[in-house]
């Protein structure tokens, strides 16, 4: 579902539909100009109660031994950059010099967007010691397209900033 035929924020989407085959071997899911239905009900198939489509709310208390399957890291496992046991009930990220704009593994735990419209929030304990340290919420499309709402430090002390990263530029 591209936005204005330029960007696709949700990545790949998979739809499951019954398939029929024509006499000449082509698969089809609908007839003529029929629309693909939003929901296809199949006899004997029950909806998973943990399904995350439509309107839903997701909260994580980070009280398990491992991150849930909905969480992921960027590019490769971030082994050693986060902990669930250092402070039980919290996800602890370790400050690292790698940013999400680099093609390396940053201290970044995320989940994929599932809707074009959403709300997200977090609670955070963070005391930056230098201008180089920042933590917050990152909306990441790729290395050149991001929004970063961060707590950091400037000449006056702790500060909050919103940075737009686009086409190699960074705007505050």
Predicted regions and their residues:
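Extracellular glycan-recognition regions
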Residues: 17, 21-172
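Short, loop-centered acidic/histidine patches that primarily coordinate divalent metals
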Residues: 1-2, 165
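Short, conserved, GDST-rich strand-edge loop motifs in beta-rich repeat architectures
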Residues: 2-9
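Short edge beta-strand segments in beta-sheet-rich domains
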Residues: 11-16
